[in-house]
Amino acid sequence: MIINAKGPASFAEKYIVRSIWDNKFPPGSILPAERELSELIGVTRTTLREVLQRLARDGWLKIQHGKPTRVNNFWETSGLNILETIADLNPEGFPVLVDQLLSARTNVSAIYFRGALRYNPDTAVDVLAKIHQLEDTAESYAEFDYLLHHTLAFSSGNPLYVLILNGFKGLYSRVGRYYFTSSDARLLALNFYKELELLAQVKNYLDVPALMRTYGMNSGKMWLQLRDDMPASIAQDN
């Protein structure tokens, strides 16, 4: 097992997570005793204890006082905060993970975009006005796209959507910077932003879902043209 880590705690965390992913420590199994595991990994018991607590908070493990530590089925117990970890664990499956991420975001964003234009159309108008000074670069488009989603999610009347976005901010930002290297992708997005701005200006929230569906389909097709050339390094949070 080859693990790149910045220190003992990082190494221990990656070792345990990799072992869970590879079924060396399968769901429902009991982790080795603390002393045995610390010797196996090569870290102090204090460091290991801190790592185990962190992994328990992320849903990988179940720690109960006086009982051995049990491995969870992380698909059932973890949240969006482990997306970065999954991308790192399974680089071959990363394109599929991105497909699923974009599909989920498209479905959810249709809800909070509509909510924002319904409850806070002036906020939507203000943020969309920035498109008229938007630089024609991948970095600028990726930053604006996230800003737009974050602003409208917060203005939708349900701030929980912001927490969902925060869960995959790093991963989505890296993918966005790659996606928007395509001038066609930038033009597609710009036309979408302009149409959304027109709806916001007249407070027409009813037509938002149809606009989102159309853009979702078109951007999805664009993504399929780009995904096979995506650098593997995007999967890693450097």
Swiss-Prot record:
Sections of the chain in a coiled coil: none
Listed GO CC annotations: cytoplasm
DNA-binding interval(s): 34-53
Molecular function per GO: DNA binding; DNA-binding transcription factor activity; fatty-acyl-CoA binding
Signal peptide: none
Keyword Transcription regulation: yes
Name used for this protein in its record: Fatty acid metabolism regulator protein
